[in-house]
From Swiss-Prot:
Its cofactor is Mg(2+); Mn(2+); thiamine diphosphate. This is 2-succinyl-5-enolpyruvyl-6-hydroxy-3-cyclohexene-1-carboxylate synthase. It comes from Trichodesmium erythraeum (strain IMS101). It is an enzyme of class 2 (transferase). One of its GO terms (biological process) is menaquinone biosynthetic process.
Length: 582
């Protein structure tokens, strides 16, 4: 038990931290500041919690987000009062929308120093609007036993709300009066002799429980799956147990004889041996309108969020098939506003129901074969064309690295073009690669810091990013000496925002280049020298493959591929519609 009895603030903060330790907290990220001194002392001196200081609050919050993604447990972030807390906001929004548990602790001035220009003071109560799962301002520190019990139970509730019913951020605003440094106060010192050793005795990590399906749910499923042609759409997913997740979807697919349209940002493509009905080229298949019309299903089983593909979404909207959306969270995953039913169960539960209730698989095998034959043809066309490309071309990067990275590598895929090329070209494999991403709100904020959080205490991690996403978060490089593990950054340097070249605005020059593509003209070799990082410029595909397998075990390095965003965009426009030529 690590309770500091020197002052009101040290007692209060150390009880808060000790409570979190008993609940399972392993890591706290702290940005420097004086108002948060009691919290900093409590975390930094706790022997069982890894506490990492990070200068920039925005970077700190995204680093914590990355660790939480990887560990599937809440991570604490701490900052001082004022605009420091505002810099947490982008990561809190992403945590909410991507359902990642974060516990946000913002130190604050006491009530008498607010709204009077006391300095470094803003209104921090409900600072993050509706984005936290729950938020509270704690009372001022006290050593009264009832107040300490209130603190303990409030922290327990806040921790639980980071995970249930849907993971997300929780905000504690914590006011402190002076003295902030651990200066002795008699009333705090006196507490030590009468403080109960059993104060934390009942605390245990909170266990997730599965809902028990009822007869109404089983009847609904039986009615939906009566001899209908159907598909499974497996969208964006960062499951805690990816192999179990993939096995469950494979069981559903083979029980119903439904093909599985698997997003590139799903682990399914990296466990392809589990699923003989895996469809990775759905976006390209659906570009053939005649075939797309034949492939319209009666029923769609949507697992979690929809894939990124606009082609798929447009086809689904026009088809207006009934969709069953499978996800335990309370989020609405129907941006198409179609005929949908949300079932708040896990995919593992659904697989168990289908198997134990003896659902038949007498669905249209010809429909299934049509999908599988199209997949085989398009995959062959992609592989043939890519194998002949010798120059550095952006779309080939995703195709190549999916066949090159070592087994069990974690990869963080940045937003904009990388996520789309992964969806188009990531080859199904058996490498058990786990993709990570920030697709809650699809921004480029915190790209590097999130990837570093995923890499922390893990040796094999890769980030695929464009130049603008990396430049937007270069403060993340300040973490280089805090990282325990390795991150290889595959940098696609196309001198600007390549995704805008795919949009109609690209035809309007000016102002397209200056205000949309926004080339930054940065020498990344010089940038790496500033931070003491390894940098290599890639000139051939063979060189890239050799540098990606095996991966180093420590440090950060950048492998830079210089591409032409206009030529890459033209290649996509010329080729994406042709792979389905039958």
């Amino acid at each position: 038990m690590s309770i500091d009895f020197r002052s009101l603030n040290t007692v209060w903060s150390s009880i808060l931290v000790e409570t979190l330790h008993h609940l399972g907290l392993t890591t706290a990220i702290i940005s420097p500041g004086y108002r948060s001194t009691p919290l900093t002392f409590a975390f930094a001196t706790h022997p069982k919690i890894e506490t990492i200081p990070i200068l920039d609050e925005r970077s700190a919050a995204f680093f914590a987000l990355g660790i939480a993604k990887k560990n599937y447990q809440p991570i604490v972030i701490v900052c001082t009062s004022g605009t420091a807390a505002a810099n947490f906001y982008p990561a809190i929004i992403e945590a909410k929308e991507s359902r990642i548990p974060l516990l946000v602790l913002t130190a604050d001035r006491p009530p008498e120093l607010r709204n009077c220009h006391a300095g470094q003071t803003i209104d921090q109560v409900k600072l993050y609007g509706n984005y936290p799962n729950w938020q509270i301002e704690l009372t001022l520190p006290s050593v009264e036993l009832k107040r300490l019990e209130y603190l303990r139970q409030t922290v327990i509730h806040g921790w639980e709300k980071t995970m249930f019913p849907t993971p997300g951020p929780v905000h504690f605003n914590i006011p402190f009066r002076d003295p902030l440094a651990p200066i002795n106060q008699p009333e705090a010192i006196a507490l030590e002799s009468k403080f109960s050793q059993n104060f934390f005795a009942s605390l245990r990590p909170i266990i997730r429980t599965e809902l028990i399906p009822n007869s109404d749910l089983i009847e609904l499923l039986k009615n939906q799956f009566k001899s209908h042609s159907g598909i499974i759409i497996a969208g964006l997913a960062q499951p805690e147990k990816p192999e179990v997740y993939c096995q469950a979807i494979a069981k559903i697919s083979q029980t119903l004889n439904f093909p599985v349209l698997a997003e590139g940002l799903s682990p399914l493509r990296n466990y392809s041996q589990l699923n003989p009905y895996l469809i990775s080229t759905y976006d390209l298949i659906l570009r053939n309108q005649k075939l797309a019309n034949k492939l319209i299903p009666k029923i769609v089983l949507q697992i979690g969020e929809l894939p990124t593909s606009k082609q798929l979404r447009t086809w689904l909207e026009a088809a207006n098939s009934h969709r069953l959306i499978i996800d335990q969270s309370d989020h609405n995953f129907d941006p198409l506003h179609g005929k949908t039913t949300h079932l708040r169960i896990s995919v593992e539960q659904l697989a168990k129901i289908l198997i134990t209730q003896y659902f038949n698989n007498n669905h249209d095998i010809n429909y299934l074969n049509l999908w599988c034959q199209a997949e085989e043809k398009v995959r062959e066309n992609i592989d043939t064309k890519m194998a002949k490309i010798n120059h550095i071309l952006e779309p080939k990067i995703s195709w190549l690295i999916s066949q090159t990275l070592p087994k069990n590598t974690s990869i963080f895929v940045a937003n904009s073009m990388p996520v789309r090329d992964v969806e188009f070209f990531w080859v199904p494999n058996n490498s058990q690669i786990q993709p990570f991403f920030n697709r809650g709100v699809n921004g480029i904020d915190g790209t590097l810091s999130t990837a570093l959080g995923i890499a922390h205490r893990y040796q094999k991690t890769v980030m695929l990013t464009g130049d603008l996403a990396l430049l937007h978060d270069t403060n993340g490089f300040l973490l280089r000496n805090k990282l325990v593990g390795h991150l290889t950054i595959i940098l696609i340097n196309n001198q600007g925002g390549g995704i805008f070249e795919m949009l109609p605005i690209a035809n309007f020059e000016p102002p397209f280049t200056e205000f949309f593509a926004t080339p930054q003209e940065i020498d990344f070799a010089d940038l790496c020298k500033t931070y003491g990082l390894e940098h290599q410029k890639i000139s051939s595909w063979n060189q890239l493959q050799q540098l990606l397998n095996p991966l180093p075990s420590s440090g950060i390095r950048i492998l830079e591929l210089q591409t032409d965003r206009q030529l890459d965009a033209r290649w996509r426009l010329d080729n994406l519609d042709t792979f389905i030529d039958l």
